[in-house]
Structure formats: structure tokens, C-alpha cells
Swiss-Prot record:
Belongs to the bacterial ribosomal protein bL27 family. The gene is rpmA. GO terms for cellular component: cytosolic large ribosomal subunit. NCBIfam families: L27 (TIGR00062). One of its GO terms (molecular function) is structural constituent of ribosome. It comes from Acidothermus cellulolyticus (strain ATCC 43068 / DSM 8971 / 11B). GO terms for biological process: translation. The keyword Ribonucleoprotein applies. This is Large ribosomal subunit protein bL27. Gene3D superfamilies: 2.40.50.100. PANTHER family: LARGE RIBOSOMAL SUBUNIT PROTEIN BL27M, RIBOSOMAL PROTEIN L27. Signal peptide: none annotated. Residues 1-23 are annotated as: Disordered.
């Protein structure tokens, strides 16, 4: 009996590479606009305020702020609460002398 099957045959299929899906930024974390929040197949999480959805259902931040997770109408929703701009003291006008 041959222990090799012969030409053009394969022992077994090969495993596919992992796609690194899942939540990338968690609740309470500060994010900048454009950062990826969730990589997913299908809409396990839905975009809330301040969040956009890409063609592959990736959720990303539209504004800078803190990430929040919640539910709306029975759906899991990811939102970004915009950060309050830090109050900067007024700079005195520079004098020439």
C-alpha cells in the first residue's frame, strides 16, 4: 500500500488567517475622530451619535470624545460623547516696547 497518494492531491485544507475582529476601544476611553471602535461582520453593534459605519460594518468615531456603549430599541449601540474643549485663558496682546 502506498503511503503517498500521488500527484495533485492534498492532505488537508489549510486554516484561514484570523481577521482580528472585535471591540478596539472600550467604554470610557477617549478617542479621536477617525479611530476604529469596533471591527465586525454584520451589525452586532450599531452606530449611535458621533459614530459612523464603514462598508465592511466597521464602526469609527466621527468626533473626538469618550466612547459609550448602550442599548436603543433592543440593539447594542456605540456612541461617542464629544469632549468639552478646554477653556484657555485669553492671551494679553503683545506690546512692541
Amino acid at each position: 500500500m502506498a503511503h503517498k497518494k500521488g500527484a495533485s492531491s492534498s492532505r488537508n485544507g489549510r486554516d484561514s488567517t484570523s481577521k482580528r475582529l472585535g471591540v478596539k476601544r472600550f467604554g470610557g476611553q477617549f478617542v479621536h475622530a477617525g479611530e476604529i471602535l469596533v471591527r465586525q461582520r454584520g451589525t452586532r453593534f450599531h452606530p449611535g451619535s458621533g459614530v459612523g459605519r464603514g462598508g465592511d460594518d466597521t464602526l469609527f468615531a466621527l468626533v473626538s470624545g469618550a466612547v459609550t456603549f448602550g442599548t436603543a430599541r433592543g440593539r447594542r449601540v456605540v456612541s461617542v460623547v464629544p469632549a468639552q474643549p478646554a477653556a484657555t485663558p485669553a492671551q494679553p496682546a503683545a506690546t512692541g516696547s
